[in-house]
Amino acid sequence: MDLDMTAHIGGVAYGSLHDGPGQRTVLWFAGCSIRCAGCVNPHLFAPDSGRSAPLREVGHVLMEGINRRDQGVTFVGGEPFDQPQALAELCEHVAQYWASWPNVPRLIVYSGYTFEQLKSRRNSDVERALNTADVLVDGPFVQKWADEDLGYRGSRNQRVIDLAETRSTGEVAMLDWDRPRIVIRRGQIISSPSISRRLGLAATSTRHCGELTPEPAAVSA
């Protein structure tokens, strides 16, 4: 990994159950050229949002997730593919140091670009990221297709793509992650906002998938 390269990072969270299967470390990339209407993180649109951090520092932040017994990593934004070189370096870092768990993707990347748009770039760093990640959740958030019960998607146009299977077969292979989720951890009930409202769970943790709330910390030395 090019340790001196910098990336614009919006924040990090550990122990997340909202951003993919298993207990995950989540890293928010700052800056987004797509700027979907209704995005849960509009404060990460600006290229200079978040802070600039060397990949050496970001790598240490990701390694802390292993110390906390997280099972996988999720990259969200902002738009991770707006920083393709930094994204590729960090994808390879995760692949090198994080173990594989049964039924838990090691690395999930969210993007407002479709898989086909990313492939059409013919960019070597984009290809490195796509060849390293396990799952890509692709496509822009579209308000008219929004559904809080989609699990790990925001709107119905978005796809959960099994990148390993796609690489193997040459055809886009999709996963079904849309089952409603209720998780109980250390006495706290964690679910989607719509399930919480229907069940009247006032004390529930209801962060939207991919949402950067005040709880995640900024990347710091």
Locations of the language-model features?
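Auxiliary Fe-S-binding modules of radical SAM enzymes
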Residues: 2-17, 66, 112-113, 119-221
